[in-house]
Amino acid sequence: MKRGYEVLRDPHLNKGMAFTLEERQQLNIHGLLPPCFLGQDVQVFSILKNFERLTSDLDRYILLMSLQDRNEKLFYKVLTSDIERFMPIVYTPTVGLACQQYGLAFRRPRGLFITIHDRGHIATMLKSWPESVIKAIVVTDGERILGLGDLGCYGMGIPVGKLALYTACGGVKPHECLPVMLDVGTDNEALLKDPLYIGLRHKRIRGQAYDDLLDEFMEAVTSRYGMNCLIQFEDFANANAFRLLHKYRNKYCTFNDDIQGTASVAVAGLLAALRITKNRLSDHTVLFQGAGEAALGIANLIVMAMEKEGVSKEAAVKRIWMVDSKGLIVKGRASLTAEKTRFAHEHAEMKNLEDIVKDIKPSVLIGVAAIGGAFTKEILQDMAAFNKRPIIFALSNPTSKAECTAEQCYKYTEGRGIFASGSPFDPVTLPNGKTLYPGQGNNSYVFPGVALGVIACGLKHIGEDVFLTTAEVIAEQVSEENLQEGRLYPPLVTIQHVSLKIAVRIAEEAYRNNTASTYPQPKDLEAFIQSQIYSTDYNSFVADSYTWPEEAMKVKL
């Protein structure tokens, strides 16, 4: 146990002025703090006052990250006190701005920075990390950060923010989490010329050297932390994201949140929307604006969900259309990847989205191309003309990249649009006086619960069924009252409860399918998982002190 000033410098131990007099004396920190004794609730109040005083979200982000650096328990107590308020600061959309200005926002290193020049020594670098038990890793190479492109080493803000939500939303213990940046360079010329840039100053290394780095990283992680260590891939470029997922998914405990997490939360929204449209998913025609990893991930999970309804895979695929930067994806068109070819249908080539919507007449329109304003007034009005209750998902992040706003959707569909977005939007009051609360299809509904469940039961491989199960659980948590208010997702204030339900369902299915490795199987899974959840309350550091009977300490001659 640390003593003296080291206690105050360790964010895992530091309680600030919440240390009692007895703790201060026993830990040799009496006199190193003002003679004031505050409860954690007062400390939260103090942080909130400072938070409200700031006018920019980037400054608020820096305030919260600085708190995380000095008092971890208080940081998570603040986050969980109002998750709806703080999630947009520690994650999307503010984390995107923080990543763009990471050189300015950088205060203290968090996580592990591994570069292409460290090949052959990654196992040694992992030993530098102070924690020997790691259950979850979020790793990025910074090539496709949100909808912002190649941010190189500045992308470290994403794994840091993601793991903060593992804890705040899912209760995964923060000291068992590790953010990792794999720095192979950047093709962003502005960053290469930026004197504040904190990463390698050369073009991205690709090819065999890149693959060798990834292989060594995966082997080193599992060698040190075990095959059950969850490795989440985050914000890799499309080509690498799919390739690496296919390469590693059956060998390691891994998933890609941009592909599978986004898919799960989108399908959850669709399943909830079906309670409004009163039909089956396989009755719908789905059109995607975008055909990258998010779109393809959602499309593949929709196919799985339709199959579960009893439709053949071929019939399900025919219900899904995609538009990429070159137009409608059709058979015979040039420049199609293997993933895109699956959703290429017999049709004339078309480029203009408005014309495509008129021709395909979709009942579901999903935007994941990070093209702000792509869903024009005409497109939204057409969707309302084709459908009694059109489903419109503008899932691109950050807010500036959203295909349309909630207000535009409701306005141009005469309030009939069923809307969800990737970034938060304010409530919208319709001309009839009814107020709708747009559903935010944030991946935060997915990955914390998935991580908690995977860790709790020791799942070694994460199949697509996990993400369909997760989508079903999320949709089940949406009440009729939520749907009446326009919400397709449970209120964010309930996200910890939702994560627990996801974790329990994942664990139940893992034990039923004999894919769990934590044995014996707990009799009460929910109680067991609840016992694993991180507590934001302070620990007591007062030594366990007691007396013996005086007679027991006497030596008789």
Swiss-Prot record:
Cofactor binding, note field: Divalent metal cations. Prefers magnesium or manganese.
Enzyme Commission designation: 1.1.1.40
Gene Ontology biological process terms from the UniProt entry: malate metabolic process
Annotated Gene Ontology cellular component terms: mitochondrion
Keywords linked to the UniProt accession: Cytoplasm, Metal-binding, NADP, Oxidoreductase
Binding site for NADP(+): 144, 258, 290-307, 397
Active site positions, chain numbering: Y91 (proton donor), K162 (proton acceptor)
One GO MF term attached to the UniProt entry: NAD binding
Main location class: cytoplasm
Subunit field text: Homotetramer.
Family: Belongs to the malic enzymes family.
Protein's UniProt name: NADP-dependent malic enzyme
Organism encoding this protein: Anas platyrhynchos (Mallard)
